[in-house]
Amino acid sequence: MDDVNSIVLAAGQAAEEGGTNNFLVPNGTFFFVLAIFLVVLAVIGTFVVPPILKVLRERDAMVAMTLADNKKSAEQFAAAQADYEKAMAEARVQASSYRHNARAEGRKVVEDARAHAEQEVASTLQQANEQLKRERDAVELDLRANVGAMSATLANRIVGVDVTTPAAAG
């Protein structure tokens, strides 16, 4: 209860002095706190903010440099991609040319082999025909030479008369 009495007495003294207890009106404490705040603000502005600003500026510079490097890398990649596409197109054209030449050469080799084989077949057929003709002529000559003797032998067997004698011929 003493505390309440002391508070009421303090309020009464303040009212007697003519001061009002309005918190919106600045008093000495406010100016003291304002002075301390300004000192702290000056200390922070002098010793804390410049290093932070320096670090932030360095970071901004690094970010800008990284962006420039990324842009340069993207341009180099695009140029390399274009070179790659160009080289691939040239390689495809060259491969197509090689493939076309190989097919043409293959067709030529096949046609040459076919012509050679046909020539060999024709030559073999001609040789076979010539050999058959020679054998036929030889057999024909042999048969003509032996036809008289064979017919006499055959007649002798069938008829039973010897036809090779001069009496039978006349």
Swiss-Prot record:
<dbReference type="InterPro" id="IPR050059">
    <property type="entry name" value="ATP_synthase_B_chain"/>
</dbReference>
<dbReference type="GO" id="GO:0005886">
    <property type="term" value="C:plasma membrane"/>
</dbReference>
<feature type="transmembrane region" description="Helical">
    <location>
        <begin position="30"/>
        <end position="50"/>
    </location>
</feature>
<comment type="similarity">
    <text>Belongs to the ATPase B chain family.</text>
</comment>
<comment type="subunit">
    <text>F-type ATPases have 2 components, F(1) - the catalytic core - and F(0) - the membrane proton channel. F(1) has five subunits: alpha(3), beta(3), gamma(1), delta(1), epsilon(1). F(0) has three main subunits: a(1), b(2) and c(10-14). The alpha and beta chains form an alternating ring which encloses part of the gamma chain. F(1) is attached to F(0) by a central stalk formed by the gamma and epsilon chains, while a peripheral stalk is formed by the delta and b chains.</text>
</comment>
<keyword id="KW-0472">Membrane</keyword>
<keyword id="KW-0066">ATP synthesis</keyword>
<comment type="function">
    <text>Component of the F(0) channel, it forms part of the peripheral stalk, linking F(1) to F(0).</text>
</comment>
<dbReference type="GO" id="GO:0045259">
    <property type="term" value="C:proton-transporting ATP synthase complex"/>
</dbReference>
<comment type="function">
    <text>F(1)F(0) ATP synthase produces ATP from ADP in the presence of a proton or sodium gradient. F-type ATPases consist of two structural domains, F(1) containing the extramembraneous catalytic core and F(0) containing the membrane proton channel, linked together by a central stalk and a peripheral stalk. During catalysis, ATP synthesis in the catalytic domain of F(1) is coupled via a rotary mechanism of the central stalk subunits to proton translocation.</text>
</comment>
<keyword id="KW-0812">Transmembrane</keyword>
<keyword id="KW-0406">Ion transport</keyword>
<dbReference type="InterPro" id="IPR028987">
    <property type="entry name" value="ATP_synth_B-like_membr_sf"/>
</dbReference>
<keyword id="KW-0375">Hydrogen ion transport</keyword>
<protein>
    <recommendedName>
        <fullName>ATP synthase subunit b</fullName>
    </recommendedName>
</protein>
<dbReference type="GO" id="GO:0046961">
    <property type="term" value="F:proton-transporting ATPase activity, rotational mechanism"/>
</dbReference>
<keyword id="KW-1003">Cell membrane</keyword>
<keyword id="KW-0138">CF(0)</keyword>
<dbReference type="InterPro" id="IPR002146">
    <property type="entry name" value="ATP_synth_b/b'su_bac/chlpt"/>
</dbReference>
<keyword id="KW-0813">Transport</keyword>
<dbReference type="Pfam" id="PF00430">
    <property type="entry name" value="ATP-synt_B"/>
</dbReference>
<keyword id="KW-1133">Transmembrane helix</keyword>
<dbReference type="GO" id="GO:0046933">
    <property type="term" value="F:proton-transporting ATP synthase activity, rotational mechanism"/>
</dbReference>
